[in-house]
Swiss-Prot record:
This is 4-hydroxy-3-methylbut-2-en-1-yl diphosphate synthase (flavodoxin). GO terms for molecular function: 4 iron, 4 sulfur cluster binding; 4-hydroxy-3-methylbut-2-en-1-yl diphosphate synthase activity (ferredoxin); 4-hydroxy-3-methylbut-2-enyl-diphosphate synthase activity (flavodoxin); iron ion binding. It is an enzyme of class 1 (oxidoreductase). Its EC number is 1.17.7.3. Binds 1 [4Fe-4S] cluster. HAMAP family: IspG. PANTHER family: 4-HYDROXY-3-METHYLBUT-2-EN-1-YL DIPHOSPHATE SYNTHASE, 4-HYDROXY-3-METHYLBUT-2-EN-1-YL DIPHOSPHATE SYNTHASE (FERREDOXIN), CHLOROPLASTIC. One of its GO terms (biological process) is terpenoid biosynthetic process. The gene is ispG. Converts 2C-methyl-D-erythritol 2,4-cyclodiphosphate (ME-2,4cPP) into 1-hydroxy-2-methyl-2-(E)-butenyl 4-diphosphate. Its cofactor is [4Fe-4S] cluster. InterPro entries: Dihydropteroate_synth-like_sf, IspG_bac, IspG_bac-typ, NO2/SO3_Rdtase_4Fe4S_sf.
Length: 372
């Protein structure tokens, strides 16, 4: 059953990244980054569409050269997802992608040279309503801050961000968001907590270079989870050395677990033991694979025996409790019918999809009525 999150989110200024609101009372946006060669337009477009299909709100694309900038323009024409151009040092690249339809510039003003270059980039962004993302990373702190602090610290990350923010403030440019990333969880969390009370702009959360799929998922879940529990964060990226599609799935799972945003089925399942009356693990693997295309939010409890099964099933939208000789299927918290092990997965998929269709029809009717 759907429950509201008890988390009180930090108040932030809202900006628009393409057609996606970020900050304010907007849903927390989930984003990823392509790992293709940007100059390979076809490969990059294919990956962006896969990321979008997984549910991403925004995608970032690295643009390291003018050749990549021209490729970015071709990519922009073939995808509908808001695109952030990741640019370092060369202000001309920023000006070019602004002309080509970028939705957000990830560029640190202090890294692009003379004030006239900074002014040119900010003017281009202002004229086209393009927000800027200030992205501070522990691995690329300014040398002066490295000397001052000796090593990356939360305070160093915040000071770096504030230097870039001061440049935007001098140009009266307020449409920006900020990220403060490190590969170390405690440092990242401390840095975000420090800056959250100092600025009103939205914050993009991430644990940078978190690692492969397993270790990166764990680090990101802990770090992002701690901040989100504090109400901090307006957009997130789970950085994994893995398929970017997996970043989106893990990102939504983090938000889903905190009841901040839901997409698809939220499975509740026991780890199984000798009391199970059906193969819980295989059933879960099959259902997750078969129902991966479902976007409708729903809690589904799959519990192998009667110890915890009835209690979990009663508070889920759909539930299954293992039993003998047959398993008991619950709908909206109430016993509905009994299911045989021989056809269990097929029956569950059918019943879940029927409920998904009913909810989608109900939502469509509400939308149609509101537009009359």
């Amino acid at each position: 059953m759907k429950q509201e999150s008890p988390i009180k989110r930090r108040k932030s200024r809202q900006i628009m990244v393409g057609n996606v609101p970020v900050g304010g009372d907007a849903p927390i946006a989930v984003q990823s980054m392509t790992n293709t060669n940007t100059c390979d337009v076809d490969a990059t477009v294919t990956q962006i569409k896969a990321i979008q299909e997984a549910g991403a709100d925004i995608v970032r694309v690295s643009v390291p050269s003018m050749e990549a900038a021209e490729a970015f323009g071709k990519i922009r024409q073939q995808v509908s997802l808001p695109l952030v151009a990741d640019i370092h040092f060369d202000y001309k690249i920023a000006l070019r992608v602004a002309e080509l339809g970028v939705d957000c510039l990830r560029i640190n003003p202090g890294n692009i040279g003379r004030d006239d270059r900074v002014s040119a980039v900010i003017s281009a962004a202002r004229d086209r309503n393009i927000p800027i993302r200030i992205g501070v990373n522990a691995g690329s702190l300014e040398k002066a801050l490295q000397r001052k602090y000796g090593e990356p610290t939360p305070e160093a990350l915040v000071e770096s961000a504030m230097r870039h923010i001061d440049i935007l403030d001098k140009h009266d440019f307020q449409d920006f968001k900020v990220s403060l990333k490190a590969s170390e969880v405690f440092m990242t969390v401390a840095a975000y907590r420090l800056i959250a009370s100092q600025i009103e702009q939205p914050l993009h959360l991430g644990i940078t270079e978190a690692g492969g799929f397993r270790s990166g998922t764990v680090k990101s879940s802990i770090g992002l989870g701690m901040l989100l529990m504090d109400g901090i964060g307006d957009t997130i990226r789970v950085s994994l050395a893995a398929d970017p599609v997996q970043e989106i799935k893990v990102g939504f799972d983090i938000l889903k677990s905190l009841r901040l945003r839901s997409r698809g089925i939220n499975f509740i399942a026991c780890p199984s033991c000798s009391r199970q009356n059906f193969d819980v693990i295989q059933t879960m693997n099959d259902l997750e694979a078969r129902l991966e295309d479902v976007n409708t939010s729903m809690d589904v409890a799959i519990i192998g025996c009667i110890v915890n099964g009835p209690g979990e099933a009663k508070v889920a939208d759909i539930g299954l409790t293992g039993g003998t000789p047959k398993n008991l299927f619950y709908m909206a918290g109430k016993p509905n019918q009994k299911l045989d092990n021989a056809t269990l997965v097929d029956d569950l998929e059918r019943l879940i999809r029927e409920e998904v269709s009913r909810r989608e029809d109900q939502d469509s009717a509400v939308i149609a009525k509101s537009s009359d």
